């Protein structure tokens, strides 16, 4: 990700989770993005960590782009304080639009949807569909078991070492953003053209 990259997609839960540390981390990420003049691209909701994150960016004077499906908007969970809220028909469209609009990706704690979003864009980096950094903010040890599984997959021969190392991890939002800015894509074979995703 070039140092002038200004659009960061953040994937995180539509629930607040069991520990206050999760919301505190979402607020800290939002504040750091605003401080750096980065635009937040996210799932467009006002609930859970998603709402905490967006509110923190807005409080800091930053720009927020939300992408939400019609079905979720109809459930009245969309954030009405956004400058840019795009409503799409399907989850596939939502993920593709977020990926296209972002220069890099961060995963905060969340459930199936959060992990689905992150691992899709991570796979696109692996395949060479895009060359954008993918990072995990490990809050309160939440992602420890998942990171252990990735290490296990590499140890068992299902992930190449350079692909395992594509996942940037950290516990400090500012430090993680610095690592994303300094990231260079792995010198791996490009398997697919972006149009083939």
Task: Label the predicted regions.
Residues 1-102, 118, 139-174, 178-179, ...:
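A cross-family phosphate/adenosyl-ligand binding-site feature
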Residues 88-89, 110-112:
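N-terminal glycine-rich "phosphate-gripper" loop used for MgATP/nucleotide binding
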Residues 105:
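Hydrophobic acceptor-binding patch used for acceptor engagement in glycosyltransferases
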Residues 124:
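CoA-thioester-processing core
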Residues 130-132:
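His-Asp phosphorelay/catalytic-motif detector in bacterial-type signaling
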Residues 135:
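Conserved beta-strand/loop subsegment of P-loop NTPase cores
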């Amino acid at each position: 990700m070039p140092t002038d990259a200004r659009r960061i997609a953040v994937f995180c839960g539509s629930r607040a989770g069991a520990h206050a540390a999760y919301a505190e981390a979402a607020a800290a990420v939002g504040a750091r993005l605003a401080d750096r003049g980065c635009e937040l691209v996210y799932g467009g909701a006002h609930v859970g960590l998603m709402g905490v994150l967006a509110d923190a960016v807005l409080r800091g004077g930053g720009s927020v782009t939300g992408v939400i499906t019609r079905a979720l908007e109809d459930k009245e969970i969309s954030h009405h304080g956004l400058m840019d809220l795009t409503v799409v028909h399907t989850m596939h469209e939502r993920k593709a639009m977020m990926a296209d609009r972002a220069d890099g990706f961060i995963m905060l704690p969340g459930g199936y949807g959060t992990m689905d979003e992150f691992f899709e864009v991570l796979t696109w980096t692996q395949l060479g569909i895009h060359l954008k950094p993918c990072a995990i903010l490990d809050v309160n040890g939440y992602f420890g078991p998942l990171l252990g599984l990735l290490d296990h997959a590499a140890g068992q021969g299902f992930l190449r070492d350079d692909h395992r190392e594509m996942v940037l991890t950290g516990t400090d939002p500012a430090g993680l953003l610095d690592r994303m800015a300094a990231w260079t894509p792995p010198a791996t074979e490009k398997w697919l053209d972006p149009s083939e995703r």
